[in-house]
């Protein structure tokens, strides 16, 4: 639905969220720690997004790197892994490491 947002970072909410404006609209975006650490207040940024709909909420998750978003999408397809858990996993390991562990079905590394 919303694949990429390019705009100005208006507000940073540590540890992993920001408000970003694009074309006069402000977006609340939750990010993994590595992406969050690359953002600078009042600077332009492009964030790859995943729009996540639940019964009780509509959430926007953001990633500086498109590959990181793709790994996030792979993770949430795994039974028992929700969006918040996938975000926490991407905060603890790089997207490349997680992708490798998912492809190898390495349960010990993922728990």
Report the location of each language-model feature.
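Short coil-to-beta-strand transition motifs
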Residues: 1-5
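Long, highly charged, low-complexity intrinsically disordered interaction regions
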Residues: 6, 10-109
């Amino acid at each position: 639905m919303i694949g990429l947002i390019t705009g100005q970072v208006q507000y940073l909410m540590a540890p992993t969220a920001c408000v970003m404006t694009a074309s006069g609209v402000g977006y609340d975006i939750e990010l993994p720690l590595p992406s969050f650490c690359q953002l600078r207040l009042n600077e332009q940024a492009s964030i790859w997004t995943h729009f996540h709909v639940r019964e009780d909420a509509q959430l926007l998750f953001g990633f500086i790197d498109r590959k990181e978003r793709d790994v996030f999408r792979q993770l949430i397809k795994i039974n028992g892994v929700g969006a918040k858990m996938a975000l926490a996993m991407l905060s603890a390991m790089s997207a490349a490491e997680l992708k490798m562990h998912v492809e190898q079905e390495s349960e010990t590394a993922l728990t």
